[in-house]
């Protein structure tokens, strides 16, 4: 099991603080300003989490694979409806390529890194750590799905009444190889 160093621990505290401050800001202060800052905040999280990993070949490989795998899944998904269901992205997440905000790749990297790191701290066998990491990613997806359309991040076809069950199943399946790579390589 890897231990958190002080810098990583501080980085996670900063990220959680921004999340709490952002939620409070959206609920009680200038909602639109906080929503507009979402892409910038996600990019900041990315750099906070990878601040000391640019010389680690395995971590850079993980970053590139995760970004590419996540963007590819989203491009196929949003343009065909085959992977996650019928959905589209709004304007909140910023610049889009092939109908997918570029920041979605960063979201896949950040959530994969955080969930994999948490799971890797638990003293259980590798397959259980992978299961925990994928489950944490799935929990994040379940929590964000009802909020995303309200802040124009993405929305599913209105006839489906929200995210279909297949979205959650395939989200876990897309996350599985990422978490397997992360846990097996002890990143």
Residue ranges and their predicted role:
Residues 1-187:
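Aromatic-rich, lipid-facing transmembrane alpha helices and their immediate juxtamembrane interface loops
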């Amino acid at each position: 099991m890897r231990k958190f160093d002080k810098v990583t621990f501080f980085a996670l505290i900063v990220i959680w603080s921004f999340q709490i401050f952002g939620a409070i800001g959206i609920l009680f202060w200038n909602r639109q300003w906080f929503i507009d800052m979402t892409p910038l905040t996600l990019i900041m999280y990315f750099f906070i989490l990878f601040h000391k990993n640019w010389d680690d070949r395995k971590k850079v490989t993980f970053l590139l694979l995760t970004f590419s795998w996540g963007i590819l899944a989203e491009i196929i998904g949003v343009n065909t409806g085959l992977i996650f269901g019928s959905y589209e992205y709004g304007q909140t997440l910023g610049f889009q390529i092939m109908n997918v905000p570029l920041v979605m790749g960063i979201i896949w990297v950040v959530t994969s890194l955080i969930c994999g790191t948490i799971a890797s701290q638990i003293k259980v066998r590798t397959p259980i750590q992978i299961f925990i990491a994928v489950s944490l990613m799935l929990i994040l997806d379940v929590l964000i799905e009802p909020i995303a359309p309200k802040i124009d991040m993405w929305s599913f076809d209105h006839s489906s009444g929200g995210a279909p069950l297949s979205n959650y199943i395939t989200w876990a399946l897309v996350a599985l190889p990422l978490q397997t790579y992360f846990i097996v390589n002890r990143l």
